[in-house]
């Protein structure tokens, strides 16, 4: 949970409910800049107690009205601390196929990513992207840099034009390919068709990624269960035939 009010309690309660009550494999989400070392130690002990041993360790979004803590400036700092405190935990890190918005260039970004892996990340999940070729190029550059952990592709279906505009405003590093811009323009005043086209575009991305033996798919559903179910129905046969590809 990236809850900006009570990260410690919310994270543990939510992961315990999902893992033990719903019996669904669970990954806890920890934002580095809003945590202290004591908070992390307590969370690790609680997660250990409830049987959750996977963590997505991020820097965390910056909220202008919430003061960050002082112990962890970057995700790498948090990952290193978790590995020192609880080496049996499996840590997932974030990566950015089109470059981190705060990085001066992609070379610097991949160098920092290599540090993240070296201190303890066992796999990575990407920021969302809409051009698979950019992902493949990024993946090749990671291999050249010595990053050999699995990289899961982050996919977000765009269901309406306002969602796309908000995304472009908050994630300025993400580029929309011409094919996707054409969808937004053609169905600007036809919400039902835009939703259908956005879902189809996401499914096409996943089909291509699985065909190219991607390590896994991370679906950004924005808490929309109907969207998740639609994409599951359209793609689950692919995962049955490619059991090595993970989805979460």
Pin down the residues of each PLM region:
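Active-site beta->alpha loop and helix N-cap motifs at the rims of alpha/beta catalytic domains
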Residues: 1-107, 214
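Active-site glycine-rich loop that binds ribose-phosphate moieties when present
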Residues: 102-121
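Catalytic cores of alpha/beta
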Residues: 35-46, 108-112, 137-140, 160-167, ...
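Generic structural signal for well-ordered alpha-helices
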Residues: 12-16, 44, 75-80, 113, ...
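Conserved, mostly hydrophobic/aromatic
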Residues: 47, 116, 120, 153, ...
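Active-site pocket-lining/capping segments in soluble small-molecule metabolic enzymes
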Residues: 70-96, 144-204, 235-248
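Glycine-rich, proline-tolerant flexible connector loops at the mouths of alpha/beta enzymes
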Residues: 1-12, 60-70, 121-135, 141, ...
């Amino acid at each position: 949970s990236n809850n900006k009010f009570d990260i410690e309690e919310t994270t543990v309660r939510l992961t315990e409910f999902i893992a033990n009550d719903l019996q669904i494999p669970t990954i806890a989400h920890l934002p580095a800049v809003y945590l202290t070392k004591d908070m992390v130690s307590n969370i690790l002990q609680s997660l250990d107690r409830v049987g959750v041993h996977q963590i997505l360790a991020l820097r965390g979004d910056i909220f202008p009205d919430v003061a960050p803590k002082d112990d962890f400036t970057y995700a790498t700092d948090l990952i290193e601390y978790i590995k020192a405190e609880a080496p049996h935990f499996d840590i997932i890190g974030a990566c950015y196929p089109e470059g981190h918005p705060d990085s001066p260039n992609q070379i610097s970004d991949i160098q920092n990513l290599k540090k993240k892996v070296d201190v303890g990340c066992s796999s990575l999940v990407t920021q969302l992207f809409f051009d698979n070729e950019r992902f493949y190029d990024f993946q090749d550059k990671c291999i050249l840099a010595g990053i050999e952990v699995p990289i899961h592709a982050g996919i977000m279906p765009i269901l309406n034009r306002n969602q796309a505009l908000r995304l472009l405003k908050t994630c300025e590093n993400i580029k929309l390919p011409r094919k996707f811009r054409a969808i937004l323009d053609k169905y600007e005043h036809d919400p039902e068709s835009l939703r259908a086209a956005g879902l189809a575009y996401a499914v096409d991305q996943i089909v291509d990624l699985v065909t190219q033996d991607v390590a896994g798919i991370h679906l950004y559903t924005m808490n929309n269960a109907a969207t998740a179910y639609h994409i599951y129905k359209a793609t689950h046969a692919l995962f049955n035939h490619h059991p090595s590809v993970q989805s979460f």
